[in-house]
Amino acid sequence: MRLLVIDGNSIANRAFFGIKLLTTKDGRYTNAIYGFLNILLSLLKECEPDEVAVAFDLKAPTFRHKMYDGYKATRHGMPEELAQQMPVLKELLADLGYRTVTAEGWEADDILGTLAAACAARKDDCFLATGDRDSLQLVSDTTTVLLAATVMGRSKTVTMDVDAIQEKYGIQPRQLIEVKSLMGDASDNIPGVKGIGEKTALTLVQNFGTLEGVYEHIDDKLIKPKQREHLLECREMAQLSHTLGTIRTDAPIDTAEGTYAVGEGNKAEAVRLLQELEIHSLIPRFGLDGIAPAAPEEEDGIELAEAELEALPLTPSGTYLVASRPAVMGKQGTRNVVLQPESWYAVQDCTVYPLEDADLVRLLDNADVTLEVFNAAPLYAKAMAAGGWGSSIVWDGKLAAYLLDASASKYQISELTASYRAAAAFTCADYPDAGRLADLFCKMKAEITACGEDSLYNEIEFPLAQVLADMTRTGVLVDKDGIEQFGVKLRTELEQVLGRIHMETGSASFNPNSPKQLGEMLFDTMGLPHGKKTQRGWSTDAETLESLRDYPLVEDILQYRAYQKLNSTYVEGLLKVIGEDGRIHSTFNQTEARTGRLSSDNPNLQNIPIRTELGSQLRAYFIAKPGCVLVDADYSQIELRILAHITGDEHMQQAFLNGEDIHRSTAAKIYGIPQEEVTSRLRSSAKAINFGIMYGKGAYSLAKDIGVTVKEADAFLKNYLAAFPKVSGYMDKTIADAKACGYVSTLFGRRRALPELASSNFNVRSSGERMARNTPIQGTAADVIKLAMVRVWKRLRNEKMESRLILTVNDELIVEAPQTEAEKAAQILREEMEGCVQYAVPLSTDVHAGKNWLEAH
């Protein structure tokens, strides 16, 4: 028999501190639960146990506290974020069939010791999973400790058996008690002997065997005079430490074989709880997929009617709820295959209508129909492919879910119905979520209203989905031949840089793509500074190389990497996704970024490089079709203008209103000098501070950005905050308000939950403060450009123009316009982008036209 015993408090603690804070949409912490269950799955795979016990401490004092008042007196209490998760974790373990073990007056360590001793008596194998090295004293021929440790900055489970203990410490496992009695244990406040550390304690135990043996040989010349003095002075404390540090093996718990066999638990309740905690990924990993969650209390005992499955009427009318049943994947040999394809369905009253594409087309642009849907984007695509616009769609649940919880990694109906506890109106075996759609949509609409996000939803996010679908359908024309020729040029540059690298290293076989070879060359062979060791050798990440850019070899390495990325990601990447029409049809992602920003993929056009001359040339291959031009409108310093408006800082506002160079004006204000005396260096510093202040950068980060000492950067920051007190006041108030309510908002009401602000961990809390400073500004900028996109798109349609909005990248919009409409398109872009909001500082755009993106930008 193989028994796995988990030190519950220790592993939960490891999981909590090892994973960033995770919360549900209603603010419940889940990171410790998620991490613990992942560790449990790994342990089950590694040990293949027949039985599993999870030991937990109780809050009550133990016999050790009664023996010594100072025992664990220096320990901080459990963080509140972790304490909230512990009862839920125990409930979940019980539902999964795992038995938890506690004993009043005893510690989890003693439970581990007692179960290990029982296994040894039966000659059964016992595995102890813990992060506490105290348990190493329990290692024996039948007991192995699986020690959760951090090795070279990474979490790792280290297997400790008798041989491993002997190799690491040079003693037997039980002798570790003797070591602890001498050196003490600061974490448990076990005193030990003054002046005796681990190295000395190990030497003494290796030579004299036990604590008693040390005192029997107290006059041995191996023991130095000062050590002898301390040993004699602290003899009673050493004996006490021995008793405190010894894990007991007689805790009053059940140790009979079979006691900890994994039971049935309550799988339906486990599914319900995992869904409620929004830890959906673990449901299949625990073999729970296909198990219906326990019904909410209000549904318990209620008989629900089975829905009718019917074909869509030839002349549909009224309101339908439309959603899709996800595809079911499976294995065919080693290949992933689709066992059941995605399928759409509509719900009206208690009837479910399976939908073919032809049915969808009849619904999507039907004056007699209104559609409340989940995930409008693919439906708009289907409508537009059929020559329509999807005008029947009036609401999208996926967009609502995103606004209500932007931190979620995905949005699925089954998960949302669980987290919202949506009541079922009927049952439907073929479409399990269909009966809960109405209540889910109703609850989401109510929450959108309660959060004050109706305007954000109705004026920006919902209409934007149609705009993005049209942009994807239209696509961007590219010069395929030009991209191919650019690739040839790029590869030539790569070969030349590689040749220089080989000359500088003196090795034609040197591979700059090998982190190992590069690290050894830079730090072992050449002896360059700033080397950092990782588990795999020398670090050669971008930050390390940037700090060494002044060395010719490193400059060439950075150049080589940049050219490689250009070639693989953009040249080769773009060529792969050019459609038959010669256009790239990138997919715009509306529900991914927590700040509200858009992203794109297939390909990602948001990161087209512009900072290098060679990289910016790529824009030349995004072109207008014959007879047309690209009209590019780019917001000028939109985030700084929003900062000026949102903080109410008069100097910053006046600088913009006067048309001044904001960075030069800032430098003049900070240093108390006329603008004409501001040097380029001072302007650069002011620019870095202007943007850095929004991102919560401190003196250290700023120093790296502008190439000054940390002390100088700190002085810059202090001067800035003194010169712009309203900016400082706004930042402080934003953080305070966010801590009070748990979120920050943009000027349009978009919320971003920040559970990090409640963390007891300084680094996590500081990260939350940076996000609190930045999100209202960056998020408002995202909202503004989205609103501008909606207004530009609608106006182009309303004025029946051929011009089409085809692309957005960061703060710019691009329209492909016939030459005869170019001037009008530019006017519309400027008017709608600058006029979509009225702030204390007017928004400003730079608008240009050209045959290609580079020329237009």
Region locations from a protein language model:
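Domain-level signal for Mg2+-assisted phosphodiester chemistry and nucleotide/NA-binding surfaces
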Residues: 1-99, 732, 746, 759
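Conserved beta-strand -> loop -> alpha-helix junction used to position metal-binding or nucleic-acid-contacting
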Residues: 5-10, 128-131, 135-163, 389-406, ...
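Extended two-metal-dependent nuclease catalytic cores across DNA- and RNA-processing enzymes
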Residues: 22-24, 73-253
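Conserved DEDDh/DEDDy metal-dependent 3′-5′ exonuclease domain
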Residues: 51, 105-107, 131, 303-305, ...
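Conserved "right-hand" nucleotidyltransferase catalytic core of DNA-directed polymerases
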Residues: 234-355, 436-610, 629, 639, ...
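Function-dense linear segments that define catalytic or interfacial modules
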Residues: 398-427, 434-436, 590-675
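Conserved catalytic core of nucleic-acid polymerases
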Residues: 473, 585-586, 590-593, 668-801, ...
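C-terminal polymerase-core module
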Residues: 492-499, 503, 507-554, 722-770, ...
